[in-house]
Amino acid sequence: MSVRTLPLLFLNLGGEMLYVLDQRLRAQNIPGDKARKVLNDIISTMFNRKFTEELFKPQELYSKKALRTVYDRLAHASIMRLNQASMDKLYDLMTMAFKYQVLLCPRPKDVLLVTFNHLDSIKGFIQDSPTIIHQVDETFRQLTEIYGSLSAGEFQLIRQTLLIFFQDLHIRVSTFLKDKVQNSNGRFVLPVSGPVPWGIEVPGVIRVFNDKGDEVKRMEFRHGGDYVAAHKEGSFELYGDRVLKLGTNMYSASRPVETHMSATSKNSASRAQENIAPNPLAKEELNFLARLIGGMEIKKPSGPEPGFRLNLFTTDEEEEHAALSRPEELSYEVISIQATQDQQRSEELARIMEEFEMTEQPERNTSKGDDLLAMMDRL
């Protein structure tokens, strides 16, 4: 497992979340000023300096449930509210989109180009906010600094770590089904056409070399596909042609997107013990979430500003039906964490929590550990 996977996972899933929210904000005719505020607030929180400092520290991936909690907090960083069914659908769309992109990356290193495509599109949402653009550019700089010198083997390990994280997710997405890139069982269709990875020859020739490295024989074979050579490599600079289209906004055509549980996904969920049994890493995940969420400096509006509810379904009835029909094993509504009273750890977490503005409820006279668990209950 690579300890450099988390930033790529978080940024790409966050980019997909913004694509979906932007599409739904437009579909529901939310006023432009409110829609811009929602996206600006979420992006500003997502690229907050303290948050990214914690994010880029070498660390292993945690459970889907722990990461889901972070995105739930992130999606509600502004005046917009999502109910449980819409949040479930949002997370399903995010994860399946990025899983598809990781599967189709021509080279393991190209997951970095996918990330840059997301960052490029995110900057398009905040063109009138130079301060937030600077935050995104600073994250780009961190990415190039950390990942620019990694070997092909290290990128392969990152890709394998991502695929292991996604391996039990087989949720059907209407866009993928219509484009015939996903089967009815929720599994993706790998193409046998298109450009090969940069620097790789089109398949069809086998060369045999002797012990001196000289070619002594050449044979041709039919590969059964329709491959072409890549005309150029995507740019890894701040500005440039990424060439690769994976990670761009697939909702720009403004078509409704639906998700459905496949039988495979339901069966996988029933076997996923992390959702129904106590998590042995609960204490570590609590610390992880406290550090990440503690870095989310969410700014509440100074004056009274009415919020609104966003529905990721066409109608309220569909949303209610989705909430009732979703398998219980796939619910992320409750995270149960049992933390022991370790004095040094409690003091450290309490210090982190002091940096996190809690304005929803008045402070109560409780212990530091209880304050932290109460915060987790309110997520």
Swiss-Prot record:
Assigned keywords, A-Z: Cell membrane, Membrane, Transport
Protein location: Basal cell membrane
GO cellular component, one term: basal plasma membrane
GO biological process, alphabetically ordered: xenobiotic detoxification by transmembrane export across the plasma membrane
Main localization category: membrane
GO MF annotation list: transmembrane transporter activity
Cited Pfam families: Oscp1 (PF10188)
Tissue: Predominantly expressed in testis.
Biological role: May be involved in drug clearance in the placenta.
Entry protein name: Protein OSCP1
Lineage, broadest ranks: Eukaryota, Metazoa, Chordata, Craniata, Vertebrata
